[in-house]
UniProtKB/Swiss-Prot annotation:
Keywords: ATP-binding, Cytoplasm, Kinase, Nucleotide biosynthesis, Nucleotide-binding, Transferase. Pathway: Purine metabolism; AMP biosynthesis via salvage pathway; AMP from ADP: step 1/1. The lineage of its organism: Bacteria, Bacillati, Actinomycetota, Actinomycetes, Micrococcales. The gene is adk. AMP binds at residues 32, 37, 58-60, 86-89, 93, 134, 145. It catalyses: AMP + ATP = 2 ADP. Catalyzes the reversible transfer of the terminal phosphate group between ATP and AMP. Plays an important role in cellular energy homeostasis and in adenine nucleotide metabolism. One of its GO terms (cellular component) is cytoplasm. This is Adenylate kinase. Monomer. Its EC number is 2.7.4.3.
């Protein structure tokens, strides 16, 4: 049973790769962005609570985010494994995820981080902003987002490095090439830990 995290900065192509890798591994991709949108749109109690913070321009507390994630990974389609995209982002969220999994007698199989140079990320995000008409996404704003990502996730990545379940993957180049590298990384971690099903590089689902 595969339970993994896919991490990467804004503009790294993480969302696209999460769907592709989850499909290859036969597990469900779970994006925290999608979880938030679903809860807010459906006006669930957690969604109403989160929207109150968002409307006030405040960060949604870890407690609310953790409960949303716990509810999502407890659903039937995640029973046979999942790929989490966008969570955890803080040490507190790492501890919360550990507790969720421990309660179910589970643990994380792998953490894969997509690495792309900041210069390329800025270029990608500026191009996306131009195409989508996001006038507020200036270079200064984008660089701030990237700096925030690096500061937020450094301790999270280090925590998982110490557990021996992290693989870092070059996120530059063609989408198919990045997917292949990710599959190779997952296979490598599986070989080292014995915690993932055998997914040979280049294998089709």
């Amino acid at each position: 049973m595969t339970r993994m995290l896919l991490m990467g900065p804004p503009g790294s192509g993480k969302g696209t790769q999460a769907t592709r890798i989850a499909d290859k591994l036969g597990i469900v991709p779970i994006s925290t962005g999608d979880i938030f949108r679903h809860n807010v749109k459906s006006m669930t109690p957690l969604g109403v609570e989160a929207k109150r913070y968002i409307d006030n321009g405040d960060f949604v507390p870890d407690e609310v985010t953790n409960r949303m994630v716990a509810d999502r990974i407890a659903q039937a389609d995640a029973e046979h494994g999942f790929l989490l995209d966008g969570y955890p982002r803080t040490k507190g969220q790492v501890e919360a995820l550990d507790a969720m999994l421990a309660e179910a007698g589970q643990s994380l199989s792998a953490v894969v981080e997509l690495e792309v140079p900041d210069e390329e990320l800025v270029e990608r995000l500026l191009k996306r902003a131009e195409i989508e008409g996001r006038a507020d996404d200036t270079q200064e704003v984008i660089e701030h987002r990237l700096d925030l990502y690096h500061r937020e996730t450094e301790s999270v990545i280090q925590e998982y490095v110490e557990r021996g379940i992290v693989a870092r993957v070059d996120g530059t180049g063609q989408i198919d090439d990045v997917t292949e590298r990710l599959l190779q990384a997952v296979y490598s971690v599986r070989s080292a830990t014995g915690s993932l099903p055998v997914i040979q590089p280049g294998a089709e689902s």
